[in-house]
């Protein structure tokens, strides 16, 4: 729950930074910037999924408990797909962030697709759902993959997108990862072994 909140809230803050751009040839052309971004969550199996995480997604409106059916007409469902546009977010500290009048701190609408796979079919299958399933329909210019728990830094998604936008021959890119050491690096001072710290 905390890991999902950390990632999802960081993504929503990054989308806010993109929407707040004043001078952009791409993002401000042909409609609001938020309409050009889709956040797709792919969860690998109902059984291993944490109920608290589903409650978090229900809080922001992406998930609805009780509407899924394991089979329809005696055919087992492969996935359950929910879509929603939300301005709500939950911080890693479990605080609900809702829209407000402050334009710079308020979160913009974010289009979300939540794909909850019936069975745990591993990560490669999840990637296939993203690229083969949703990618063929949405036809995105750029896909950025994040694991739950990864907190994107300020403007980090924008930096990755700019790399692709400015170089049409670019086939892949990766961001830089830093360990979260806690407030004031409390954990960092206790990690004396550099291999453990890495």
Swiss-Prot record:
It is a multi-pass membrane protein. It is an enzyme of class 2 (transferase). It catalyses: [(1->4)-N-acetyl-beta-D-glucosaminyl](n) + UDP-N-acetyl-alpha-D-glucosamine = [(1->4)-N-acetyl-beta-D-glucosaminyl](n+1) + UDP + H(+). GO terms for molecular function: chitin synthase activity. Transmembrane segments: none annotated. GO terms for cellular component: cell septum; plasma membrane. Keywords: Cell membrane, Cell wall biogenesis/degradation, Glycosyltransferase, Membrane, Transferase, Transmembrane. InterPro entries: Chitin_synth, Chitin_synth_fun. GO terms for biological process: cell wall organization; chitin biosynthetic process. Its EC number is 2.4.1.16. It comes from the Eukaryota. Pfam families: Chitin_synth_1 (PF01644). It is found in: Cell membrane. Belongs to the chitin synthase family. Class III subfamily. Polymerizes chitin, a structural polymer of the cell wall and septum, by transferring the sugar moiety of UDP-GlcNAc to the non-reducing end of the growing chitin polymer. This is Chitin synthase 2. It comes from Rhinocladiella atrovirens.
